[in-house]
Amino acid sequence: MIYETAPAKINLTLDTLFKRDDGFHEVEMIMTTIDLNDRLSFELRKDKKIVVDVEQTYVPSDNKNLAYKAAELMKKTYNLQQGLTITIDKNIPVSAGLAGGSTDAAATMRGMNRLYKLNRPLEELCALGIQIGTDIPFCILGKTALCKGKGEIIEYLDKPPSAWVVVAKPDLGISSPDIFKKLDLTQPHTVHTEACENALISGDYEQLCKSLSNRLEPVSGKMHDEILKIKANMLENGADGAVMSGSGPTVYALARKERQARHIYNAVNGCCNEVHIVRLLG
């Protein structure tokens, strides 16, 4: 049996530059990882089936699950005959803007690479993974990075300074395609990509907090004002910086001290069904 840890990602920045001819948006975003993890195990079967075993009933176990899709893609690409069972211990909130599905798919590709002794380079897996999810290449590598294109052009950056992260997901679901459809690229909105990159290079925590920005936040916030209320609540209760991750609805806050993070946690815990205190990984 093979084990893999699948950490959640957060966006330090997210900018959308223009709509591409292939229907996707050209993005420029800085992402890092946090120690909120799913845990996956992989075991060979005697038949050819892919079986996904996940305890939570709201998580699909068929080909709607990105881990299942990743396993299908790996089997087809590398002509793998023997089936496998994928067991997922799910801790990352779903449909949250934290790449919970993508990180499971990435862990599946890494896990199968070891389980079947394929020894393929991770960069090769990234090129495969982009076929089923734009966050998957980042999740396969799992390091702080500037991602461009659809998300497949990856430039490694320095790890962020050490900090606590309070992650809060309100009780609502958001469809990423719906958010991108409602995005008006003619509306002015500043995303501080370069400032964030410089903050990572210099290890400047205060500048990092000031640079947190997301082009999709006003769009998701207009549809669901809970998002902006949570962000305001975090900042009012001592967050050094706060921003929505991905297309939402999750908002996170950065804090230098654990006591500070606990205070923010207590402030938002009553209005969110899922709140976690974790650490930046990067």
Swiss-Prot record:
Entry-linked Pfam families: GHMP_kinases_C (PF08544), GHMP_kinases_N (PF00288)
Which reaction(s) does its UniProt entry say it catalyses? 4-CDP-2-C-methyl-D-erythritol + ATP = 4-CDP-2-C-methyl-D-erythritol 2-phosphate + ADP + H(+)
Listed A to Z, the keywords are:
ATP-binding, Kinase, Nucleotide-binding, Transferase
Q: List the disulfide bonds.
A: none
Q: Which GO terms describe its molecular function?
A: 4-(cytidine 5'-diphospho)-2-C-methyl-D-erythritol kinase activity; ATP binding
**SUPFAM superfamilies of this UniProt entry?**
GHMP Kinase, C-terminal domain (SSF55060), Ribosomal protein S5 domain 2-like (SSF54211)
Keyword Kinase: yes or no? yes
The name on file for this protein is: Putative 4-diphosphocytidyl-2-C-methyl-D-erythritol kinase
* Originating species: Staphylococcus saprophyticus subsp. saprophyticus (strain ATCC 15305 / DSM 20229 / NCIMB 8711 / NCTC 7292 / S-41)
Upper classification of the source organism reads:
Bacteria, Bacillati, Bacillota, Bacilli, Bacillales
